[in-house]
Amino acid sequence: MPGNTKKSADSGLTAKDYYFDSYSHWGIHEEMLKDDVRTLSYRDAIMQNPHLFRDKIVLDVGCGTGILSMFCARAGAKHVYGVDMSEIIHKAVQIVEVNKLSDRITLIQGKMEEIQLPVEKVDIIVSEWMGYFLLYESMLDTVLVARDRYLAPDGLLFPDRAQIQLAAIEDADYKSEKIGFWDDVYGFDFSPIKKDVWKEPLVDTVDRIAVNTNSCVILDLDLKTVKKEDLAFSSPFEITATRNDFVHAFLAWFDIEFSACHKPIKFSTGPFSRYTHWKQTVFYTHKDLTVKAGEYIRGTITCKPAEGNHRELDIDISYTFNPREPNREPVSEDLSYRMC
Amino acid sequence: MPGNTKKSADSGLTAKDYYFDSYSHWGIHEEMLKDDVRTLSYRDAIMQNPHLFRDKIVLDVGCGTGILSMFCARAGAKHVYGVDMSEIIHKAVQIVEVNKLSDRITLIQGKMEEIQLPVEKVDIIVSEWMGYFLLYESMLDTVLVARDRYLAPDGLLFPDRAQIQLAAIEDADYKSEKIGFWDDVYGFDFSPIKKDVWKEPLVDTVDRIAVNTNSCVILDLDLKTVKKEDLAFSSPFEITATRNDFVHAFLAWFDIEFSACHKPIKFSTGPFSRYTHWKQTVFYTHKDLTVKAGEYIRGTITCKPAEGNHRELDIDISYTFNPREPNREPVSEDLSYRMC
C-alpha cells in the first residue's frame, strides 16, 4: 500500500495545525468532484433517467457545491431543494446562478432537522452522504430524517442501497511501516504510541493482490426502510482463505447501488474497483495468521457510535481461526478499534 | 507535480470532516518523525555536538513526542525542559519514562507565555517551530518569547537561522488541473470557486526541472536577534530566467541552519533537495509569462498576519516583467494571497 501517511493536528506548542484544510479550503470539494467513480455514478444515475426526474420535486441532502442539484435540474426536475449547513452553500448559490439554474434550484443553509422546506413532500431524495467505512462521520442519519419527514410514500432515494464488505489481507510490509515503526524511532522506544496507533483503523488504498480471502457482507442497508438504530450493528462473519498466505489485517469497504434507475447503477469502493477518495479501511490484527487455502476465519464485528461522542465509531472485531493441522496453533482475538 | 489534492472540512450537511486527523491522531507525528531530512538534521546537530550540550540546561519549545528532548539528553544535557500545550505531552511523558530518561527530562504542558520554568535561565533552546512557507502557523513567536525570557546571554539556539527563497516555475499542466479545472466541472461553470482557489497558495512538491529562474532570498532570519515585528516583512525581489520558457507561478521554500554546530548543519525544503513534509509553496500568477534566458522578473513580496486572525497569513506579490523585444508585451500584476 502506498505510504501516504495520515496527518493530525495534535502537535506543536501553539496551534501548528497540519489539517489539510488549513491550507486548502477547496481541496475536499476538488477531491470529491474529481473522484469520478463517485461523481459519474451520481451523474449517470440521475441524467440517464430523465423519465424519473421530469417534473419531479427533488431534495438534495448535503448539497455542498450543488453539483447533484444541477444534475437533477438538467435531468428535468421541476424544482430542486438543496440543503447544507456548511458555508459552502454560499458558493453553491453563486454556482447555480452562473449556470442559470436559480429558477429551478433553491438552496437552504441549515440543519435538515431544523429547517422547513417550502413543500410538504418531495418525490426524490438525492444525497452523497457516505463517509469512510461508510458510516464514519456520514450524513446517513440526516438522510433518514429527511426521508421520514419529506419523502412521498412512493418516492425514490438516490442511492437506495449500501453494503459493507469484510475480507482479510496480507500486509506485512506496510504493517511494520505503520505499527512496527514505533518500536524503534531513531533508537528510542515509542511503544506508548504504538498501542494507540493499533486501535485506529487505517484509511488507505489496498492493492487487490493483498486480499487473500473471499469477502463477506457485514451490513446491507435498504435506505427506504433502514432505521437510525440499525446503524449500530453486530454481524457474524466467515471468510475463507483463497491461497496459502499470512493474514495481517481485516479489510472493509462499501458498495453503493442506485436500484431505482432504469438500468441499476452500482459502484464499489473496494480494492477490486477503481480508486475512490473513500479508499478502504484496514483493521490490523495483533497476531499474524498462517492460513491455508480453504481455511476459515470466523468472527463477529460490532459497530456503534462511541459513548459520549456520536461522531466517533467504536468497532470491535472478535475472531477465531482453527488451522486444519495441529502443527499450527489456533488463534483467536478480541480487538477493539475506534475511528475518531 | 503529483496531483495529491489537499483536503478540507468545509463539506457536507453534518460534520462530514475530511481532516486527515479525523482518522489518524498519530499521523502527523509519524510524518514528522519519518521526515528524516528534518529529524536527522536535528539529531545530528544535537548528537554530533556533545561538547555543546554536556551538562547544559536545555529548553525544547513545542516538544511534541519528546524526540528532540531525548536527543539532547543523549547528547549529555544536564537537564531538558520540554514544553508543549498539546495533549501529546502525556504520551511524551510515557515515552521519556520507557526510555529511562525521566530523571533528565521534565515535560510541562502549557503555553510558553504562561508557564513558569523551575530555572531562571537555560543554556540552549531547541525547537522545531517551522510551518509551511516557514511562517504559516509556525511557533516562531513562541520561540522568541522563550528566548527573551529564558535564554542565557551567551546561550545557543538550535536552529539559529532561517531563510525564505523565491523563484519562478513552469507549471502549465498542474495549473490547469488545479485552477482551470473549475471552468468546466462536468459541464458546469464553477468559476465562483476558481477565483478563491487562485488566492490560496498551494503547498505541494515541485519537480526541480519546473524551476526556470534563479532564486532570491526574500527573508533572512537570525534567530538570536529577530523580533516578532520582523516576521511581518516586505522584500523586493529580482529573479532571472535561466532558459526560454513560460512562467506560471512563483515558488517559495525555506532553508534552515544550525550554525552553532562544530560543523554547521543545514537543510533545505526546496525543490533541489530531498522531500520534506513542508514541501514547497506555489503562488499561481493570473497571467502566464513568456520569458527568455537572462530576462528579469522584478517585484515586491509582502507577508503579514491577517487582520483579525493572526493564524492566517496575507501575502501580496507585485511584479513587473519587461521582455527584451517589443513583440512580447510587458506584464505586471498585483496579486494577493491568503494562507488560512
Swiss-Prot record, chains A, B:
Give the Enzyme Commission number.
2.1.1.319
Q: Which residues form a coiled coil?
A: none
Main localization is nucleus
Q: Which residues form the SAM-dependent MTase PRMT-type domain?
A: 16-311
Where in the sequence is Phosphotyrosine found?
Answer: Y19
- Active site annotation, chain numbering: E128, E137
The positions annotated for binding S-adenosyl-L-methionine are H29, R38, G62, D84, E113
Function, as annotated: S-adenosyl-L-methionine-dependent protein-arginine N-methyltransferase that catalyzes both the mono- and asymmetric (type I) dimethylation of the guanidino nitrogens of arginine residues in target proteins. Asymmetrically dimethylates the polyadenylate-binding protein pab2, modulating pab2 oligomerization.
| Self-association state and partner proteins as the record states | Interacts with pab2.
Per its record, how is this protein called by name?
Protein arginine N-methyltransferase 1
State the organism of origin: Schizosaccharomyces pombe (strain 972 / ATCC 24843) (Fission yeast)
Give the taxonomic lineage as stored in the record: Eukaryota, Fungi, Dikarya, Ascomycota, Taphrinomycotina
